[in-house]
Swiss-Prot record:
Entry keyword set: Pyrimidine biosynthesis, Transferase
Species: Pseudomonas fluorescens (strain Pf0-1)
EC numbers for this chain: 2.1.3.2
A cellular-component GO term for this protein: cytosol
GO biological process, one term: 'de novo' pyrimidine nucleobase biosynthetic process
Protein name: Aspartate carbamoyltransferase catalytic subunit
Reaction it catalyzes: carbamoyl phosphate + L-aspartate = N-carbamoyl-L-aspartate + phosphate + H(+)
Pfam assignment, any one: OTCace
Family: Belongs to the aspartate/ornithine carbamoyltransferase superfamily. ATCase family.
Oligomer and partners: Heterododecamer (2C3:3R2) of six catalytic PyrB chains organized as two trimers (C3), and six regulatory PyrI chains organized as three dimers (R2).
């Protein structure tokens, strides 16, 4: 379980500003806090009668999703529209990609149409980095999820949710529960929590759904729900990603729910003001009980709302960083 992006900060320009948003690995705490603060300021836009600001007017954002998505794709579309960008969403199932066109050829054709930014979701880990290295450097690349590797905007919207409900990270205990092995969300959340100073990060899963080397993320590993949930402030549930599983990692979904499903009884072991989160889609009766998903501890729908603001922040900051980099290069070329 080695991070793909521990070398040079490809995501940043020469001034240390966001240029692409590929992963949370290697990003400093100050930058993550800036993203959260910027998103906080954008939450007010969603309450307006006219939900628009002109920050990306005249810019074109292309959403290119090679995997199915509802929340991520829709919230990226809304985020770009609220920033006044022109938005194109490529339906990969009806595009030339379904006829054998390569990922790079698809994006280069879109690039030739003068797109300013690509939001890409792909099933291969490292796809976003590959695109950022090979597409025109003036085009910002935002990772909407790549394989098992990373889902940085989901990680940041989860951090915004925690901060708005808990005030900060320095004294929190956070448990991430479920299919850790196949979850890009788990990786992004572990990185973000560690960077933002959370002192107690726990992962709870059966041994077959824990990746090798997970200890490098500075987490405590539990294989018992009762023990792992004791006195936690935040529970982040993850779905079973059957589409990524090979072999008999689990006896059955029913057995998983019996041992690792979040029920009202199990949640009673957490702190009384604990919040429950889930990136979606929810599988009720598999990883979470309906009474918990719809109950007073749940902030799952808040996550969706905060997701729009986080994606507005990332889109605007990456576009600003690209513009600053071009100005820097022009000045130094004179």
């Amino acid at each position: 379980m080695t991070p793909l992006d521990t070398k040079r900060p490809l995501q940043l320009n020469d001034q240390g500003q966001l240029r692409h948003f590929l992963s949370l690995d290697g990003l400093r705490r100050e930058l993550l806090t800036e993203i959260l603060d910027t998103a906080d300021s954008f939450l007010e836009v969603g309450a307006r009668a006219v939900k628009k600001v002109p920050l990306l007017r005249g810019k074109t954002v292309c959403n290119v999703f090679f995997e199915n998505s509802t929340r991520t794709r829709t919230t990226f579309e809304l985020a770009a529209q609220r920033l006044s960008a022109d938005v194109i969403t490529l339906n990969v199932s009806t595009s030339s990609a379904s006829k054998g066109e390569t990922l790079l050829d698809t994006l280069r054709n879109l690039e030739a149409m003068a797109a300013d930014m690509f939001v890409v979701r792909h099933g291969d880990s490292g796809a976003a980095h590959f695109i950022a290295e090979h597409v025109c450097p003036q085009v910002a690349i935002i990772n909407g999820g790549d394989g098992r590797h990373a889902h940085p905007t989901q990680g940041m919207l989860d951090m915004l949710t925690i901060r708005r409900h808990k005030g900060g990270f320095e004294n929190l205990s956070v448990a991430i529960v479920g299919d850790i092995l196949h979850s890009r969300v788990a990786r992004s959340n572990m990185l973000a929590l560690k960077t933002l100073g959370c002192p107690d990060i726990r992962v709870i899963a059966p041994k077959t759904l824990l990746p090798i080397g997970i200890e490098q993320y500075g987490v405590k590993v539990y294989t018992d729900m009762t023990e792992g949930l004791k006195d936690v402030d935040v529970v982040i549930m993850l779905r079973l990603q059957r589409e990524r599983m090979t072999g008999g990692l689990l006896p059955s979904e029913g057995e998983f729910y019996r041992l690792f499903g979040l029920t009202t009884a199990r949640l009673a072991g957490a702190k009384p003001d604990c919040i429950v989160m889930h990136p979606g889609p929810i599988n009720r009766g598999v990883e979470i009980e309906s009474a918990v998903a719809d109950g007073p501890h749940s902030v799952i729908l808040n996550q969706v709302t905060y997701g729009i603001a986080i994606r507005m922040a990332v889109l605007s900051m990456a576009m600003s960083g690209q513009t600053a980099q071009r100005q820097f290069e022009q000045e130094n070329a004179q």
